[in-house]
């Protein structure tokens, strides 16, 4: 019988922050309670309106209210803090609301970021999967009125929900019946067993590729956090038999087909590694950490899919950085060398600690700027 590694043995992280990572990975994120779905007859959808708290935090008012104007608590939007939350409705004229004589499934706030839509935007769709025969129309809010990400429509297509059954609600609207499922997941906080239902259903519609070992690269990704030096990591994994993939150059179906077929998945932590929600139970996952702060959402996903996971420090940042802002310096670290030695990978020891001068200069230049530089290249 093969003995599984303990959590501490899975961490190839600098000693001074290892306990922080260990705590994140030892946390139990699963909630055992049953989920429910509120059914609201002749209820109203109130598009979110922005409000500013006394401390400056921005939040929303809106959601679902019943035919007496009472807020339906299960329609709230909560991400662990008041910023961006939607916890109550607001006064409105029932007589002026438009009426749609259809039954709809409430999807909540549509987050126009692929990674966040992936793990948050489908958290109510467990009920859709369990009740496919109802052929629901679905309703979402788009409070920032941004162009909807193409992956949203790809998800709807794979689920079998046509565009004419998707409603982005922008004015107060009454519906014959609104189904309001509880969320199956709160980012970085908890998940229910139903969390994986939409992903399992989507995955069942797509044939797996015989991809064995894959590396999800960011080197051709021109948005999001600036990461410099990943080409060195990519080279290491390519030389050790991993197929290099560039997710942003693939359709969603193609990405899922590779994830579904892979026995081992490696990559710098981010949206691409969150795609492991489509992986098989027990898949090996090698997460290359880009900061000294653990991303609890990845630990949550690992628990949900029972991953054979490893967390490997790959950042060369001379100063503390914020995961979602950067800039990030990546390279071949002693941590990666330690993982390679343990798992039988070959690595060029001469490259340990190497950073291109141009990357170092760019890091310092951007780090000292007092403005956001997330999308600078």
Where are these regions (language model features)?
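The feature primarily captures lumenal catalytic ectodomains
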Residues: 1-376
